[in-house]
């Protein structure tokens, strides 16, 4: 009787143990998660170039690898009962975390250049009052914050009565920004430019060029200023030209990956794009919402309905 009562219990335990053996897809998920954690540590340690490459290329690749492992797990779960197993729950939780945090930008990217500063004084790149569509250190006001190359980048456009265009904004000419002169925020040497790309109609954009027509100025060693989405044919410069602060470098356009005319501008620590670290760009002697600012970062609008970015213009 004693043997008879123990054997079924022991059999059930062995059966459950066999049923919850860790399948190869679960083991693969565990290995991938371990690599994913190490990759995030490299990013968070702000190691410069290694962290940039891991953030730009490594994390998305790991996030993408979670998809085939997930499909593998689904197939094994459907065709190999029992469906509910502790090991499978762990496996699916891991691939979900990898896929989500590897593919969805969640917070400002940590960079070794966060404390960078310079003696160069940067002026605003336009002559009258414009609205800051995106700018500042926080993700809530600056969607650029999740991207290494333009972590502290800005988008600007002029507005009238809260609108960036007249009528319905169906044509480029209806946007107040289109054709407006853009000036150099600081003196520098032209090291790269693009001037021949088309301007797209509003709500359309290039699928091949991010920056569109643009100018890159080498302000000082390891400091490169990018001004992007310029109007076709508006750049009056050639590579090697020396540009003085306040000189015209182009006109606002809608080239590249821009759904409506605006100016994008940022600093980065090397010429290569997008494999670079953004540098904090602070402007000097400007007016923000009617208040004089000696040095600061104009703040963009939040995602809340009716939100407005700071209205900024050159100071005296």
Feature locations, PLM:
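Surface-exposed, glycine-biased beta-strand/turn segments
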Residues: 101-212, 307-316
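Short histidine-centered loop motifs in beta-beta connectors
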Residues: 223-246
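Acidic, glycine-rich catalytic/binding loops that coordinate metals and/or anionic ligands
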Residues: 209, 241, 266-316
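Membrane-anchoring/interfacial helices and their immediately flanking loops
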Residues: 1-46
